[in-house]
């Protein structure tokens, strides 16, 4: 069956209905983050709910639902984009020599400088301290920089890793 991505808005209706998880933001499985994103929804909703003392009216709930969506949507849209990007990366680039060199350098940088460098994949998958959007922006910038330096011959697989990191 076909795979799809859901990016809808609003996620709520008149203070009595709220979409969460795949109902609000289904994503293709190419990052393996769908369930994690849904669990993050629940944590964020709980945090917002605790900040509002005993909501009792539809207006109270509408305020909560609006706050929840405004904090989550940028991250759920980002993981949806990242999952599609990862599909294309796996489909089109795994045999590309430049991509393979980039991946080799990323792995070496992460291993040698774990406190200073984290690849896009690791930012998304293993770093709970930043949201998907921040991970996407930082990861894309790193990918672009490494690919450009490789393509322009500024670095190669034999380059000193400290110098690569400093660039």
Predicted regions and their residues:
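C-terminal helical "tail/cap" subdomain of flavin- and related membrane-associated enzymes
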Residues: 47-167
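FAD/FMN-dependent oxidoreductases across multiple families
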Residues: 1-60
């Amino acid at each position: 069956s076909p795979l799809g991505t859901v990016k809808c808005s609003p996620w709520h209706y008149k203070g009595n209905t709220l979409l969460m998880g795949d109902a609000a933001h289904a994503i293709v499985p190419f990052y393996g983050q769908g369930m994690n994103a849904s669990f993050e929804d629940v944590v964020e909703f709980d945090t917002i709910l605790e900040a509002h003392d005993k909501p009792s009216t539809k207006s109270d709930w509408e305020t909560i639902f609006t706050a929840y969506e405004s904090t989550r949507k940028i991250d759920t849209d980002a993981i949806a984009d990242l999952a599609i990007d990862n599909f294309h990366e796996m489909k089109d680039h795994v045999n590309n020599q430049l991509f393979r060199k980039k991946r080799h350098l990323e792995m070496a940088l992460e291993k040698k400088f774990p406190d200073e460098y984290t690849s896009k994949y690791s930012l998304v998958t293993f770093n709970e301290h930043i949201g998907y959007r921040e991970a996407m922006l930082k990861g894309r910038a790193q990918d672009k920089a490494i690919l450009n330096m490789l393509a322009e011959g500024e670095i190669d697989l034999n380059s000193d890793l400290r110098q690569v990191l400093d660039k």
